[in-house]
Amino acid sequence: MSTHSNHPFHLVDYSPWPLTGAIGAMTTVSGMVKWFHQYDMSLFLLGNIITILTVYQWWRDVSREGTYQGLHTY
């Protein structure tokens, strides 16, 4: 008997991007609250930078997985 079984659904690998996306969203919202209460907008900008970098790197990984590993279709 084979110990390998195919699943009817796609099992994803572990990824740091959901965690960094959540951190970026939390930082953005915290920065907006800080900015709306008459403070500077540095935390808001930091959150946006984290979110933009996360989105870029996450889609880079999706593109690589689809191109080199055949895991995603376009």
Swiss-Prot record:
Gene3D superfamilies registered for this protein in UniProt: 1.10.287.70
Write down the top EC class of this protein. Answer: translocase
Q: Where in the cell is it found?
A: Mitochondrion inner membrane
Write out the GO cellular component annotations.
Answer: mitochondrial inner membrane
Keyword Ribosomal protein applies: no
Provide the GO MF annotations for this entry: cytochrome-c oxidase activity
According to its UniProt record, what is one Pfam family this protein matches?
COX3
Any GO BP annotation: mitochondrial electron transport, cytochrome c to oxygen
What's its membrane topology? Multi-pass membrane protein
- Database matches in InterPro entries: Cyt_c/ubiquinol_Oxase_su3, Cyt_c_oxidase-like_su3, Cyt_c_oxidase_su3-like_sf
Supply the alphabetized keyword list.
Membrane, Mitochondrion, Mitochondrion inner membrane, Translocase, Transmembrane, Transmembrane helix
The primary location reported for this protein is mitochondrion
Main function:
Component of the cytochrome c oxidase, the last enzyme in the mitochondrial electron transport chain which drives oxidative phosphorylation. The respiratory chain contains 3 multisubunit complexes succinate dehydrogenase (complex II, CII), ubiquinol-cytochrome c oxidoreductase (cytochrome b-c1 complex, complex III, CIII) and cytochrome c oxidase (complex IV, CIV), that cooperate to transfer electrons derived from NADH and succinate to molecular oxygen, creating an electrochemical gradient over the inner membrane that drives transmembrane transport and the ATP synthase.
The protein in question is named Cytochrome c oxidase subunit 3
Q: Which organism is it from?
A: Drosophila simulans (Fruit fly)
The organism's lineage is: Eukaryota, Metazoa, Ecdysozoa, Arthropoda, Hexapoda
